[in-house]
Amino acid sequence: MYTHGHVDHVFGTPVFDAENAELGRPRAKVLAHEEVDPRFDRYIATAGYNGVVNQRQFQLPAFQWPTDYRRPDVTYRDHLDVTVGDTRFELHHARGETDDATWVWVPDRKVLCPGDVIIWCAPNAGNPQKVQRFAKDWAVALRAMADLGAE
């Protein structure tokens, strides 16, 4: 499951795909918010620009923006319940750092997986070289997660 479409959250998938192929197992299904796929399209269209911006921001002069993405197999708009074994996962959409963020609640275990809806600084409203963030919606999502009583 992708918590959002930033490259640091989606580029580990090929390792799992390769292992499954090597072991003769089917490829795992990737779940994500419906805006992840359009994000990948934007990333491909702006790869040169994103490469330059990220080289400067992260001081990585050799960094090349990727153009090959493992697309989601299952997408959702507002909310999706998924059961794996006997565990139910509630996927919730939030706009915060990105417009395609997902946070996950595991109600039977009172476990919260916030993805990057919780990061080292909030709200991170963005910077002039990147897409603006969604500070008000982000605050609403943080309150919704806080109200769950995660343990």
Spans of features found by a protein language model:
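Short acidic, glycine/serine/threonine-rich loops at helix termini
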Residues: 11-15, 41-46, 123-126
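Active-site metal-binding motif and surrounding structural segment of the metallo-beta-lactamase
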Residues: 1-29, 75
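Active-site neighborhood of phospho(di)ester-bond hydrolases with catalytic His/Asp-centered motifs
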Residues: 1-6, 31-33, 113-115, 150-151
